[in-house]
Swiss-Prot record:
InterPro entries from the UniProt entry: Flavodoxin (IPR050619), Flavodoxin/NO_synth (IPR008254), Flavodoxin_CS (IPR001226), Flavodoxin_lc (IPR010086), Flavoprotein-like_sf (IPR029039)
Entry-linked Gene3D superfamilies: 3.40.50.360
Protein name: Flavodoxin
Flavodoxin-like domain: residues covered: 4-165
Pfam families, sorted: Flavodoxin_1 (PF00258)
Required cofactor(s): FMN
Induction statement: By low iron conditions and by heat shock. Iron regulation is mediated through the fur protein.
Family, similarity comment: Belongs to the flavodoxin family.
GO MF entries: electron transfer activity; FMN binding
Keywords annotated in UniProt: Electron transport, Flavoprotein, FMN, Transport
Domain of life: Bacteria
Function comment: Low-potential electron donor to a number of redox enzymes.
Length: 176
């Protein structure tokens, strides 16, 4: 089993593609990818490092598979778990709700002990509001807009994965 579990929910395939991009950069020996629709509580509990991919739909709603999984998520003890979040949203058509689902999932896992890493700068995005903010200048995780800024996705993912790997001291973990 890989040391990192990447779990995603996706209707259009965008968040799944991001999850696979992240896995490719980290390496299949380091990270495995799971569709949350086919995952269990035990699947998440098996990993001490989690990368959770959640898109935002319409007016700030979580993707339906994640929404269905939230009650299970609420049963997990996240103490000792390191978690990085990533998600897709549309900063133009849904500017008041851009990547809100990042905040929704954070609000579930953080009170249950999760240590969240991978905050991402808001610079370069054009939105009105987001529940996915860690502070005025950062999202709680990587925000991707495949609708309005697909040309920035590869660079954003690459930089974020490097940042998260450093925050997790991944080289030390892999060599232990």
């Amino acid at each position: 089993m890989a040391i990192i579990g990447i779990f995603f929910g996706s209707d259009t395939g965008n968040t799944e593609n991001i999850a696979k991009m992240i896995q490719k950069q980290l390496g299949k020996d380091v990270a495995d990818v799971h569709d949350i629709a086919k995952s269990s509580k035990e699947d998440l509990e098996a990993h001490d490092i989690l990368l959770l991919g959640i898109p935002t739909w319409y007016y700030g709603e979580a993707q339906c598979d994640w929404d269905d999984f939230f009650p299970t998520l609420e049963e997990i003890d996240f103490n000792g778990k390191l978690v990085a979040l990533f998600g897709c949203g549309d900063q133009e058509d849904y500017a008041e709700y851009f990547c809100d689902a990042l905040g929704t999932i954070r609000d579930i896992i953080e009170p249950r002990g999760a240590t969240i890493v991978g905050h991402w700068p808001t610079a370069g995005y054009h939105f009105e509001a987001s529940k996915g903010l860690a502070d005025d200048d950062h999202f709680v995780g990587l925000a991707i807009d495949e609708d309005r800024q697909p040309e920035l996705t590869n660079e954003r993912v690459e930089k974020w994965v490097k940042q998260v790997a450093e925050e997790l001291h991944l080289e030390e973990i892999k060599n232990a």
